[in-house]
C-alpha cells in the first residue's frame, strides 16, 4: 500500500448527502476482485448518460476536476452495503482523500486499509472546504497527515483528528498484510521454537 504523508491536489465538490456505495460503484462493476480498472465505474450512473457518453454536468467530468485527488462530500458518505469495491474505485480514479462530516463505519475502515484518508470535519469547516473546492482548477488543497492539517488555496488551515493507529498505518503504507509482515522475525522465531519443542508435530 502506498504511504500517505502529504497530498496536494485539486479537490472536487460533491455536496450530496447519503452517498452510498452503490452510487460510488454500481453493482454491475462488482464482478471482479481486481482492484484496478474500477475507476471507470466510479459514480457511473451520474458520470455517464444512458448512451454511455460522459455527462458534462457531473463534477468529475468537468475539465478542472478530471484529475481530482480529493473529494469534499456531504454527510454520511459511504453508507449502504459494505462493498470494498467502493474505496478501490475511488483509489483507481485517483482519489486519495475524502472529506465529510461523517462516514459509514465499514466504508471508513475500508478506506484506511486501502490507502485512502477519510477526514471528518465539522459542518462549518466542510462549508469552507466546499467553497474552496468550488473554485475549479484553483481548488487546490494540501492534506498533511503528519501535522493533521488541511491547507486551502488562500493559505487558511483546518485541523483534523485521526485515530493514532490508523494514522501510523497510512503514514507507513501498512495494510493488514503489511502489519503482519512487520512481525515477521517474531513469527519466524515462534515457529522455530515450536518446531524445536515439538519435533513430532
Curated annotation (Swiss-Prot):
Picking any one GO biological process from the record gives:
L-leucine biosynthetic process
Report the CDD domains cross-referenced here: IPMI_Swivel
Q: Which GO terms describe its molecular function?
A: 3-isopropylmalate dehydratase activity
For this UniProt record, the keywords arranged alphabetically read as follows:
Amino-acid biosynthesis, Branched-chain amino acid biosynthesis, Leucine biosynthesis, Lyase
InterPro entries given in the database record: 3-IsopropMal_deHydase_ssu, Aconitase/3IPM_dehydase_swvl, AconitaseA/IPMdHydase_ssu_swvl, IPMI_Swivel, LeuD
Quaternary structure annotation from Swiss-Prot or TrEMBL: Heterodimer of LeuC and LeuD.
- Protein source organism: Sinorhizobium medicae (strain WSM419)
- Family assignment? Belongs to the LeuD family. LeuD type 1 subfamily.
Higher taxonomy = Bacteria, Pseudomonadati, Pseudomonadota, Alphaproteobacteria, Hyphomicrobiales
What top-level branch of life does the organism fall under?
A: Bacteria
Q: What is this protein called?
A: 3-isopropylmalate dehydratase small subunit
The chemistry this enzyme catalyses reads: (2R,3S)-3-isopropylmalate = (2S)-2-isopropylmalate
The metabolic or biological pathway listed in the UniProt record of this protein is: Amino-acid biosynthesis; L-leucine biosynthesis; L-leucine from 3-methyl-2-oxobutanoate: step 2/4
Q: Among its keywords, does the record have Amino-acid biosynthesis?
A: yes
**Task performed by this protein:** Catalyzes the isomerization between 2-isopropylmalate and 3-isopropylmalate, via the formation of 2-isopropylmaleate.
A cellular component term (GO) from this record? 3-isopropylmalate dehydratase complex
Which Gene3D superfamilies does this entry report, sorted A to Z?
Aconitase, domain 4
Its EC number is 4.2.1.33
Amino acid at each position: 500500500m502506498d504511504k500517505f504523508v502529504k497530498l496536494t491536489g485539486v479537490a472536487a465538490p460533491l455536496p450530496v448527502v447519503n452517498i452510498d456505495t452503490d452510487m460510488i460503484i454500481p453493482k454491475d462493476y462488482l464482478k471482479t476482485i481486481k482492484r484496478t480498472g474500477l475507476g471507470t465505474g466510479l459514480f457511473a450512473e451520474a458520470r455517464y448518460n444512458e448512451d454511455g457518453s460522459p455527462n458534462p454536468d457531473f463534477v468529475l467530468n468537468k475539465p478542472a476536476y478530471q484529475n481530482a485527488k480529493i473529494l469534499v462530500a456531504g454527510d454520511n458518505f459511504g453508507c449502504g452495503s459494505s462493498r470494498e469495491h467502493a474505496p478501490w474505485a475511488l483509489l483507481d480514479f485517483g482519489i486519495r482523500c475524502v472529506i465529510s462530516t461523517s462516514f459509514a463505519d465499514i466504508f471508513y475502515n475500508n478506506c484506511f486499509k486501502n490507502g485512502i484518508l477519510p477526514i471528518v470535519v465539522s459542518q462549518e469547516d466542510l462549508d469552507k472546504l466546499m467553497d474552496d473546492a468550488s473554485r475549479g482548477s484553483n481548488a487546490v488543497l494540501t492534506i498533511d497527515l503528519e501535522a493533521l492539517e488541511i491547507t486551502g488555496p488562500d493559505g487558511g488551515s483546518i485541523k483534523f483528528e485521526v485515530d493514532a493507529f490508523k494514522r501510523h498505518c497510512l503514514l507507513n503504507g501498512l495494510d493488514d498484510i503489511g502489519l503482519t509482515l512487520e512481525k515477521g522475525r517474531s513469527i519466524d522465531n515462534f515457529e522455530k521454537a515450536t518446531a524445536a519443542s515439538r519435533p513430532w508435530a
